[in-house]
Amino acid sequence: MARYFRRRKFCRFTAEGIQEIDYKDIAMLKNYITENGKIVPSRITGTRAKFQRQLSRAIKKARYLALLPYTDQHH
């Protein structure tokens, strides 16, 4: 039987020692949204709940300030 092992998910913010997620760091926030503009869930990214909440708030704030788009395109 062939078995495959998934890579263990880890929280990038805990590993790097980041305390607060900044809404102005657009390059980092883009890693956590899909091409359609949706926030990627923590079960996919491996982010801890504390940082997932901060990430969600930062993305929503960046969207409100027009730093990130709400959707990919409007048709």
UniProtKB/Swiss-Prot annotation:
Cited InterPro entries: Ribosomal_bS18, Ribosomal_bS18_CS, Ribosomal_bS18_sf
Any Pfam family: Ribosomal_S18
Biological-process GO terms, alphabetical: translation
SUPFAM superfamilies noted in UniProt: Ribosomal protein S18 (SSF46911)
Keyword Disulfide bond among UniProt keywords: no
Signal peptide from the UniProt entry: none
Keywords annotated in UniProt: Ribonucleoprotein, Ribosomal protein, RNA-binding, rRNA-binding
GO cellular component, one term: cytosolic small ribosomal subunit
GO molecular function: small ribosomal subunit rRNA binding; structural constituent of ribosome
Subunit architecture: Part of the 30S ribosomal subunit. Forms a tight heterodimer with protein bS6.
Family: Belongs to the bacterial ribosomal protein bS18 family.
Its job: Binds as a heterodimer with protein bS6 to the central domain of the 16S rRNA, where it helps stabilize the platform of the 30S subunit.
Protein name: Small ribosomal subunit protein bS18
Lineage, opening ranks: Bacteria, Pseudomonadati, Pseudomonadota, Gammaproteobacteria, Enterobacterales
Encoding gene (name): rpsR
